């Protein structure tokens, strides 16, 4: 099995086999509702929309204090961060799963690249610098499982933290020097990419 690029490599390899205009992405532990497409696809009537991201649900929230705390944090991320970003027009990101991409948007932004651990964050910024818009849907929920052990949670957070730092290093200069982006949006975007450093204190 060719594991080059891991998830990003798999997504990149699958692009040639995609015949449709849109790509729904779910991790293995996600259980989208039957009407997921009916509730999300209408947003793509706006041809400038490249991504529709939905809110994550938590099928095992009540498992332990650890899962309840994770659910609380993730709910805050989606309601406050993602909701605020989409409302204000700041940079926003696809969360890696529970959403739909327009294939043309992926291709226009340069495709899935393998040089960061958070390929979703990387592609999100490249797409928005190309002029694509993202839509966050708070009212559409994609249920999934939360890590149930501290070791699994630490591994997940380490990937997110390292990937965020890699994206900051990769994209910071490009964002700073990009014409057509307001100074306030640049500051917000750089802060967004750099904020993964707070997980050092969590872990």
Predicted regions and their residues:
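Long helical/loop segments within the catalytic core of UDP-sugar-dependent glycosyltransferases
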Residues: 3-22, 34-117, 128-129, 150-190, ...
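Active-site donor/metal-binding and catalytic loop motifs
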Residues: 138-152
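Catalytic donor-sugar/metal-binding loop of nucleotide-sugar-dependent glycosyltransferases
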Residues: 115, 124-142, 200
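Glycine-/small-residue-rich active-site loops that bind phosphorylated ligands and cofactors
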Residues: 2-3, 32, 142-145
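Membrane-embedded multi-pass helical conduit in multi-pass membrane proteins
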Residues: 195-203
């Amino acid at each position: 099995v060719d594991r080059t690029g891991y998830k990003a490599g798999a997504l990149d390899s699958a692009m040639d086999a995609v015949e449709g205009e849109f790509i729904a992405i779910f991790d293995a532990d996600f259980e989208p509702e039957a009407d997921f497409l009916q509730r999300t696809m209408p947003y793509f009537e706006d041809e400038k929309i490249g991504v529709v991201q939905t809110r994550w649900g938590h099928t095992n929230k009540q498992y332990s204090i650890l899962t309840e705390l994770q659910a609380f944090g993730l709910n805050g991320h989606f309601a406050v961060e993602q909701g605020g970003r989409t409302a204000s027009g700041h940079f926003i990101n696809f969360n890696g799963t529970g959403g739909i991409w327009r294939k043309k948007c992926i291709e226009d932004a340069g495709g899935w690249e393998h040089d960061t651990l958070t390929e979703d964050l990387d592609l999100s910024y490249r797409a928005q610098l190309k002029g694509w818009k993202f839509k966050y849907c708070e009212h559409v929920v994609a249920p999934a499982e939360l890590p149930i052990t501290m070791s699994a949670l630490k591994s997940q957070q380490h990937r997110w933290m390292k990937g965020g730092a890699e994206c900051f290093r990769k994209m910071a200069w490009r964002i700073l020097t990009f014409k057509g982006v307001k100074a306030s949006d640049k500051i917000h975007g750089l802060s967004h990419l750099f904020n993964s450093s707070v997980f050092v204190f969590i872990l």
